[in-house]
């Protein structure tokens, strides 16, 4: 059996989702007690945060942190055989792309031998810079995808001016002769293709297709989420969300 690229920390726990408060705090019940969990997801997590749904939390690496748990995943469509996990931790795509690079699991990064995270370019800081002998520098920006509508995995699930800025930056990179790639980690299994959510953020959607035409590479990889961790699967085809 192939090793999972990103195993969850030891000591993860499931509980029942109660509510979200002030965007970055989630209440769950576990063994009849209320537990507050940190969420790093600033998006809407549209359709996932249903009271009574099962959620997964990991223990904080820092024992002195105010909230002792981190929100990792939500159960969608129940706990039965039709249900599945959806990963909501937005730090996962950055860690996944690095782990996949070192494991040789990114076909579009073949030949590159150096991975540097969070590198500055101009006034921006991008998630990763890859270099290799005789190859153009490859800049990578990572996004987490949790929404699926009519079999289409969509991003974003809330208006994102920051995301639009990243697309403009990636187009500028390509115009200067370097490579630019968007790594979208679709942390759920039911998306058959991928596209920008034009109903939610028309500006981002328009810039997405402009970036495609400009030569920005789009890699919406499917993530395989389980209670023990996340693995990486293939790239979904692009489509328009209509």
UniProtKB/Swiss-Prot annotation:
Annotated InterPro entries: SfsA, SfsA_C, SfsA_N
Any GO molecular function: DNA binding
Gene: sfsA
Name assigned to this protein: Sugar fermentation stimulation protein homolog
Similarity-based family: Belongs to the SfsA family.
A Pfam family recorded for this sequence: SfsA_N
Natural source organism: Nitratidesulfovibrio vulgaris (strain ATCC 29579 / DSM 644 / CCUG 34227 / NCIMB 8303 / VKM B-1760 / Hildenborough) (Desulfovibrio vulgaris)
Gene3D superfamilies hit by this protein: 2.40.50.580, 3.40.1350.60
HAMAP family in the record: SfsA (MF_00095)
């Amino acid at each position: 059996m192939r090793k999972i690229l990103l195993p969850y920390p030891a000591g993860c726990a499931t509980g029942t989702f109660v509510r979200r408060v002030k965007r970055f705090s989630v209440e769950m019940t576990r063994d009849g007690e209320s537990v507050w969990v940190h969420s790093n997801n600033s998006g809407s997590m549209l359709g996932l945060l249903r009271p009574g749904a099962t959620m997964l939390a990991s223990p904080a690496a820092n024992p002195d942190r105010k909230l002792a748990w981190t929100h990792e995943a939500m159960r969608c469509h129940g706990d039965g055989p039709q249900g599945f996990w959806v990963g909501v931790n937005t730090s996962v795509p950055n860690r996944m792309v690095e782990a996949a690079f070192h494991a040789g699991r990114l076909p579009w990064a073949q030949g590159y031998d150096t991975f540097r995270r969070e590198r500055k370019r101009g006034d921006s800081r991008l998630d990763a810079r890859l270099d290799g002998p005789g190859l153009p520098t490859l800049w990578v920006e990572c996004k987490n995808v949790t929404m699926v509508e009519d079999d289409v995995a969509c991003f974003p699930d809330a208006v994102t001016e920051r995301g639009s800025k990243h697309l403009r930056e990636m187009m500028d990179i390509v115009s200067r002769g370097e490579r630019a790639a968007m790594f979208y980690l679709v942390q759920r299994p039911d998306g058959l293709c991928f596209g920008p959510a034009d109903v939610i953020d028309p500006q981002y959607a328009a810039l997405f297709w402009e970036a495609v035409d400009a030569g920005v590479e789009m890699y919406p990889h499917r993530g395989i989420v389980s209670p023990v961790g996340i693995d990486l699967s293939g790239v979904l085809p692009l489509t328009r969300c209509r």
